[in-house]
Regions:
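Cell-envelope/extracellular polymer assembly enzymes that use nucleotide-activated donors
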Residues: 1-3, 30
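Aromatic-flanked redox-active Cys/Sec active sites in thiol-based oxidoreductases
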Residues: 8-9, 36
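Short, well-formed alpha-helical segments that are part of the catalytic scaffolds
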Residues: 10-26, 30
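A conserved acidic beta->alpha catalytic loop
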Residues: 21, 33-46, 50, 63-64
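Short acidic donor-binding/metal-coordinating loop in glycosyltransferase active sites
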Residues: 36, 62, 82, 88-92
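Short helix-capping segments at alpha-helix termini
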Residues: 50-56
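Catalytic-site signature of metal-activated, phosphate-bearing donor transferases
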Residues: 68-76, 86-88, 92-187
Length: 187
């Protein structure tokens, strides 16, 4: 079974398109999404979307702190509710002929393309504990003994979007720099 796991905030302008894109490629059995303070219609769009498809799930509300903190809350809330978690950002998209293989490993990386290419862990074994580290550009790490990871190959790529709410903030880079500086001096 696969559970969609996301954190969102003020994504009403893109969230239905994102969820429709996911459903085209991934058979979801459950979903756990954490909203970090939306003031728009994001939560209603999400719940209506999944209600129409009869896919059960949960929406939770948590105050925003940083990426690792909020992603970890989302992971904890989804723990054990499926065999695997499919982790996705609200403004990302899947292109091509993406197919999830038979899931036997503890983690799977997907290919991101566009101006340059890279891999990101996006599917994890939900019977094991995981933790994100990093206030920005966070990384997920298994917290117990893990089997090997696998890169899902094929004629597809994910696109890391730039249309989410956070990217609309003209002060994003200044705020990110301040957050990194503050975090540096705390350690």
């Amino acid at each position: 079974t696969i559970c969609l796991n996301m954190i969102v905030k003020n994504e009403s302008h893109i969230i239905k398109k994102t969820l429709t894109n996911i459903i085209k490629y991934v058979r979801l059995d459950y979903w756990v999404i954490c909203d970090t303070g939306s003031t728009d219609n994001t939560v209603n769009i999400i719940t209506s979307f999944f209600n129409e498809l009869n896919i059960p799930g949960e929406i939770h509300n948590h105050e925003w702190k940083d990426f690792a903190h909020n992603r970890n809350l989302s992971l904890d809330l989804a723990y054990g509710k499926s065999d695997y978690l499919f982790i996705f950002d609200a403004d990302d998209e899947i292109h091509g002929s993406f197919k999830i293989p038979s899931l036997t490993k503890d983690s799977y990386m997907v290919l991101f393309g566009g101006g340059y290419s890279y891999k990101r862990t996006s599917i994890i074994n939900n019977r094991k504990k995981w933790k994100y580290f990093g206030v920005l550009h966070e990384v997920i790490v298994g917290q117990e003994e893990m089997t090997e990871s696998m890169v899902i190959t094929g004629e597809y790529h994910f696109v890391s979007g730039r249309t989410g709410s956070r990217n609309m903030n003209i002060n994003k880079y200044t705020e990110d720099a301040q957050l990194l500086e503050d975090t540096f001096y705390k350690t």
